[in-house]
Amino acid sequence: MASVKRPDIYDFSKEAPRHRLERKVYPEVNVSGFSHNDEEVAFFTQVAALLRSGDVVLDFGAGRGEFMENDPSIYRRQMQNFRGRCARVHGCDLDPVVVENPTLDSAEVIEVGKPLPYEDETFDLIVSRYVFEHIADPKWAAGELLRVLKPGGWICAMTPNKWGYVALVSRLVPNRIHARVLSKVQPGRKEMDVFPTTYLLNRPSDVRRHFGHAAEVYHYSTSGVPSYHFGSMALFRLQQLIHRLSPPLFDLGLRFFIRKEDVRGQ
């Protein structure tokens, strides 16, 4: 199928084998740059509904902003980049590379167990992309995120489901070889973007336990476009079938929307 060459929609120079497969399977990618069941577009559409122009936003675990470098979909990049859409975007990460993130107005390197470098009730919105699965101290993370969030503010997090097949297999693979394995399973994935996993905040019950005392916790589960398939069309199709047949308990991803209680009743 011929593709519409629209550099303002889809950047072919950033297309990895997994993106190429997606474009073959889902014709609409050739129209808009993303598929009808794109999990990231769905999540960031929810976030966009919450975002206001005067908001101060924290990107928790912001990393280097790899989506700006690796994602061929212009729309998906725009949805994930909050800079210019709100008052200010702060970012923090354990990795010093966060200071190079082009989507942030300011960046801070943090340490587990130490207070985040922000005053109480600073942020209207906190976004976390695939970070919860790496958190080694959930009590610390939840406490600090709730501390720096304004009353009535939202924490929006996307993370794997602990009982999805990707997380189940991942827990069988030693962290020391995760990067090597993922580069084979998910062609185009760079080693610098792979980190040790803990899966301590990857069930709804885990998130409610750590955040629920001071916040309302909403979530949904999802299994969208396959991405762990070695670049094989056969495996891609097999994973599509698994996604359709699996009950929600075994969906690949979880999306959390956590609203801090507002004692003022607003």
Predicted stretch roles:
Residues 72, 120, 138-142:
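Conserved strand-to-helix beginnings and helix N-cap segments that scaffold or border functional pockets
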